């Protein structure tokens, strides 16, 4: 991508993303920092919604089954692509790896995100506590959660109380999955920013996911599911911040060692905090997560610690792009 970036006019950069997930936050932040903005919608109905916002300059409808054409059009527009969960789900990790447009972050990490076993191996490489992973139902000796590969927002995940229930449920599955130990405690999702400009890992915020049939009004009548419908704000105990930052740094080092590229931009570690205050990480996202939407427009509680002013993640991305462009470091941000 470095050759494409060299051809870009740095005075006319555009920021683009798929019209979903965190697009409003990303594009609002980009416009605030003076960039042209492009939203790429799945269909015309979605496009109409995004066209109402003043900070979005152009709204396209794109063919996600053949994203290469859209990527080439983005390059012609001097655009930088910001990936998020809907991009991974709609376009697919294989197309995302090959899309010929500068893309924020460690693009190769998308391949690892698509495989739940590789994800857990990477967390283990980082020296971060993880839940037990069962390769076979015969190993199970307690409650477990079954999760599918890919960015699905929790859709289809289910809990089994033991081996017999698990074996019965697995017979109906037709896609790849992982069986993990079910953890008891408080869910907490940590937002980080890896900055090539400032040479640091920032703890930027945290959230709790609000999940249908787990957190909703079911009164015990509905089977638990884990479809994410929104996110709740979370301010962590200050005594937890050093270990959370340490895990973020260790993860970044493991990515560089095992995946072969440096983290750049936002990422997330997803965890359970147990009653002894220990943290077990069961998932990661190598790009911006929807939980950052909780402080859109008024800034994360930790952004003031780094910049002495409130900043949301969309603004943080735009800030890094602006400073990287000035310093000639865009090729450290985009792959």
From Swiss-Prot:
Its EC number is 6.3.4.23. Keywords: ATP-binding, Ligase, Magnesium, Manganese, Metal-binding, Nucleotide-binding, Purine biosynthesis. Pfam families: DUF1246, DUF1297. ATP binds at residues 137-189, 211. Residues 107-315 form the ATP-grasp domain. Gene3D superfamilies: 3.40.50.20, ATP-grasp fold, A domain (3.30.1490.20), ATP-grasp fold, B domain (3.30.470.20). Belongs to the phosphohexose mutase family. Its cofactor is Mg(2+); Mn(2+). Binds 1 Mg(2+) or Mn(2+) ion per subunit. GO terms for biological process: 'de novo' IMP biosynthetic process. Pathway: Purine metabolism; IMP biosynthesis via de novo pathway; 5-formamido-1-(5-phospho-D-ribosyl)imidazole-4-carboxamide from 5-amino-1-(5-phospho-D-ribosyl)imidazole-4-carboxamide (formate route): step 1/1. The gene is purP. It comes from the Archaea. GO terms for molecular function: ATP binding; ligase activity, forming carbon-nitrogen bonds; magnesium ion binding. It comes from Pyrobaculum arsenaticum (strain DSM 13514 / JCM 11321 / PZ6). Catalyzes the ATP- and formate-dependent formylation of 5-aminoimidazole-4-carboxamide-1-beta-d-ribofuranosyl 5'-monophosphate (AICAR) to 5-formaminoimidazole-4-carboxamide-1-beta-d-ribofuranosyl 5'-monophosphate (FAICAR) in the absence of folates. This is 5-formaminoimidazole-4-carboxamide-1-(beta)-D-ribofuranosyl 5'-monophosphate synthetase. It catalyses: 5-amino-1-(5-phospho-beta-D-ribosyl)imidazole-4-carboxamide + formate + ATP = 5-formamido-1-(5-phospho-D-ribosyl)imidazole-4-carboxamide + ADP + phosphate. Mg(2+) binds at residues 270, 283. 5-amino-1-(5-phospho-beta-D-ribosyl)imidazole-4-carboxamide binds at residues 21, 86, 231. Transmembrane segments: none annotated.
